[in-house]
Amino acid sequence: MMHLIISMESGSLNHELLKFFEYDSSVPTNSAFYQQRSKLSVSAFRHLLKEFNLKFPLEKFRGKYYLIACDGSEFNIARNPNNPDTFHEPNGKSVSGFNMVHTISLYEVCSKRYLDLEVQPGRLKNEFQAICSLMDRYAYGGSPIFIADRGFSSYNVFAHAIENNVDFLIRAKDLNVQRFLGVETLPDKLDTTIELILTRTQSEKKHKHPEKESQYRYICKNIAFDYLDPDDISDEYLLKLRIVRVEVSDGVFENIITTLSEEDFTPDDIKYCYNLRWGIETSFRDLKHTIGATNLHSKKTEYVAFELWSRLILYNFCSIIILHVPVKSRNRKHEYQVNFSLAMKICFDFLRGVAPPNVESLISKYILPIRPDRNYARQHRVQKPTSFSYRFV
């Protein structure tokens, strides 16, 4: 059953069943598929993804670090106005409203592989909670560096990383950094280490270290922080952070909060590593439009999660094969890479057992130039899922 779900493409469910069972007259019905699918759980797909990744060691940055990008993405699912957790009212993106789930993924940028996933109803998304859960159950060892955008900047996220003994690079807004430092303006360039004492009380008389009063930061009961008891106002938590401010383009500066030491990572090193985070953005494009994660075959959120996990497994399967395909270097203007779209189609057939004569040789025939300096504005599209009715059959 899991093999079937992983190998599904963008056709209708009947078509996918026919292909998987090689057009046998005893092919299972849709109803039989639904009954067997209900016996599965998300934990089975999570276990399969982890065990599959562990069979193929991840590539390390500088021979030591795993660079793990974390980011969110959205997937439109079948319209159901009666589901308040996923339904969005009509707006500029949709005239009839739409249903959506939100995902937060971990992606190792050097190996080009997904490591873990959190799926949340679109209306109940909580990226802070998601990345904390992903850090808590990280299971790949080594020296991971979590890299995330400014939407993940929070005291609770920093503390979870420190408590789980993982490093991080997280971009932060100017306003947040000003509050950390207790200043009104920021210099163009900055590289400093700060110590903050987090507490649930605003009373200076109850602070344990009055000589460090400027380092105290108050967290109210309504703000999640898992290492302070909300009912114990005497509880305190020491947080040590490094703040680096770098120029990303002419006159444009960004703040990056990290736990990496100055001895091991200069500001330029941090800027370089953070820029590698863009790999997860391009992987979302391949995941949605090449692997076909937008062409779902399920309506219920639980079963949508099955398909999203299966797309990650399939993406990793294709990525592992593609990264082992040698691309011949020739005297050309550009460096070249494998055409992921065509390579994925070949890997699809290979997974189904329709083995081409030589998978790696066939994939290496289809290559594309690498143009690293290309930039395009992000397009805003109408929010609409792929219909169950109008698909290739």
Residue ranges and their predicted role:
Residues Y66-I68:
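Conserved beta-strand elements of the Class I
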Residues H88-E89:
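Amphipathic beta-strand/beta-sheet edge segments enriched in Tyr/Trp
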Residues L49-K50, L54:
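Glycine/small-residue-rich loop that forms an oxyanion/phosphate-binding "nest" at active or ligand-binding sites
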Residues E16-Y23:
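Short alpha-helical "recognition helix" segments of helix-turn-helix
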Residues M1-G11, K19, F33-L40, A44-L48, ...:
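Single, function-defining residue in the core of a domain
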